[in-house]
């Protein structure tokens, strides 16, 4: 069953709870949630789309094209089978059926990171063709490779939406040596000039 949500700018949000249904208010035990996750019955649903306007950021209910764009992203799957550690201090997602590194990224986020990594890898030979030295090519691609790693901090399903006074923003993932479970996440646009922007990542 899928629940449809509305975007509103007035009223009070529902009380925050990690173990209660937002729709019915019924309690949901963590053993049940974890079992559903391990059975592959937990998915993702696009709830809202944010855009920047003259008077600030605005949020809208996604239309069919935006929803389809999120669902139709097709990553290569080359890293899909790389497993997460079976257990570890601060690693909590495995209990919910997230056992591979690819489980920490939405299909669209995987496409972004794969594209960035592929372009950076191709730069080495291009620099040599243009007359650069092997040392220079290694230095450039190594630095940009680190930028791809940094981009993953903003392109992950562990990124939450931080609501605060003034302008809200995406809270980056992997800021600490923990991989916690998150119940909603924000997808960054790598070309929007905000958190997760590729050029901002490179210049910082």
Q: Across the structure, where does each feature detected by a protein language model lie?
A:
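Nucleic-acid modification enzymes, centered on SAM-dependent nucleic-acid methyltransferases
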Residues: 1-204
């Amino acid at each position: 069953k899928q629940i449809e949500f509305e975007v509103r700018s007035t009223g009070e949000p529902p009380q925050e709870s990690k173990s209660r249904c937002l729709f019915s208010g019924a309690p949901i035990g963590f053993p049940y949630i974890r079992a559903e996750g391990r059975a592959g019955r937990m998915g993702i649903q696009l709830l809202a789309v944010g855009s920047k306007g003259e008077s600030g950021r605005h949020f809208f209910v996604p239309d069919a094209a935006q929803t389809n764009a999120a669902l139709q992203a097709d990553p290569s799957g080359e890293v899909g089978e790389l497993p997460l550690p079976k257990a570890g201090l601060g690693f909590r997602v495995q209990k919910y059926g997230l056992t591979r590194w690819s489980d920490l990224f939405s299909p669209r986020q995987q496409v972004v990171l794969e594209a960035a990594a592929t372009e950076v890898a191709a730069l080495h030979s291009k620099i040599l063709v243009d007359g650069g030295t092997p040392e220079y090519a290694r230095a450039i691609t190594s630095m940009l490779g680190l930028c791809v790693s940094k981009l993953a901090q903003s392109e992950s399903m562990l990124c939450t939406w931080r609501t605060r006074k003034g302008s809200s923003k995406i809270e980056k993932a992997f800021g600490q040596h923990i991989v916690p479970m998150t119940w909603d996440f924000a997808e960054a646009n790598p070309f929007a000039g905000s958190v997760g922007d590729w050029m901002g990542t490179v210049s910082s």
